[in-house]
Amino acid sequence: MIRVVRRYEFSAAHVLARSDWSDARNRAVYGKCANPAGHGHNYRIELTLEGVVDAAAALDEIVAKRVLAELDGRFLNQEVAAFARVVPTAENIARHIWDTLADTLSPARLAGVRLVETSNNSVEYFGSEPSP
């Protein structure tokens, strides 16, 4: 089987904090990432596809319209509906990207989403867990 990996980049800000927790608990769990003023990242998405992958231009257009337009340049907690009640951790962002794209790439199949948040932190999601 051949897999194709396509990469995309976006910048976004977020706060890692649960509204049902105290500030002290959020700081204890999320550290400096719980700063109410937020912080930003230059993210890299790596999509792994299997099967027949249509022209890269078509894939790029789908990702641009469905993912990048929603996430790039945004304060995720405040501007993206998916994160109104879900903490926008790297894991949850990767899951959201999967949920957004998984049914739109036929005849190809989305096999994985890798989200690189920093040089030391990345996550991979393979669609095996339901969204929160």
What do these predicted regions represent?
Residues M1-P132:
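Charge-rich, low-complexity N-terminal segments
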